[in-house]
């Protein structure tokens, strides 16, 4: 029983960590919208979650860090999420690839997904709590 609860919480923790990391990347894109030659960055949430849970299909293995203080691998691979540069939808004179419409929409979508995950976890804990009541 406790193993099942631990597995579910581990999945939820991993998913929330990836959502928070994606939120950081999207916020960074928005903050650097006027920075010349800045390239918008993002992660593919589905493949990052599969990679973090050890379900990746082939591909390169991530370097293991034995301490949180170690420098990250090139490309910002955190939580098993490989950072990708978003392709330009409209060319910019200063070389910046940030589209504020795309970034705001992705930020809002990610925030909604994060809120849904938190609501799911909260409901799960309420169910467990009611099951343990005499």
Task: Pin down the residues of each PLM region.
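Amphipathic alpha-helical polymerization modules
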Residues: 1-134
């Amino acid at each position: 029983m406790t193993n099942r609860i631990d597995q579910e919480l581990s999945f939820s923790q991993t998913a929330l960590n990836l959502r928070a990391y994606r939120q950081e990347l999207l916020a960074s894109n928005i903050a650097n919208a006027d920075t010349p030659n800045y390239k918008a960055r993002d992660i593919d949430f589905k493949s990052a979650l599969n990679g973090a849970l050890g379900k990746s299909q082939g591909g390169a293995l991530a370097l293991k860090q034995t301490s949180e203080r170690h420098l990250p691998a090139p490309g910002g691979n955190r939580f098993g999420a490989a950072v990708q540069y978003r392709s330009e939808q409209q060319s910019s004179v200063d070389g910046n690839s940030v589209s504020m419409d795309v970034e705001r929409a992705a930020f809002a979508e990610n925030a909604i997904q994060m809120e849904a995950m938190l609501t799911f976890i909260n409901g799960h804990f309420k169910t467990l709590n009611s099951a343990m009541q005499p």
